[in-house]
Amino acid sequence: MGVGVTQSEPITAMRAVIKVEAAEVVDSKFRDRKERAQKQFATDLKVISGAGERDGETFSEWFSFLASGEIGSKTKTGQLLTAALGEDAKAETLEELASKLVGKTFAAQIGTSKDGQYSRVIHDTIAPTPPEAAKGDDT
């Protein structure tokens, strides 16, 4: 890849296959609508396909959930876990769940943050990787 200034425009794609390169549990500085404490999976995501010339690039994304570890199936985090892990979307600890995500793929639309500066996985577009797309992941 070389060295130099990285691409400054956020990655966008209508439908991309994305691989979780890294995931860790961190405390969120935000609270939910009921003012409950939250945690997040802080992830580094690599675009495998679907973003044209931006394929192969990585971006950071945070998936929030209640600090208690309750993760609803319709939340963005729940959709990620179900798409990437399927029936294996559970663990003894949050850290174990985060480690299970590493190396897994899922499909989703990539949009931008509200300010337009950062790439973001779009809620309600997250799904398992189509079998034909998974075969193309030789990284």
Task: Please give the residue ranges for each predicted region.
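Short beta-rich binding modules
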Residues: 1-139
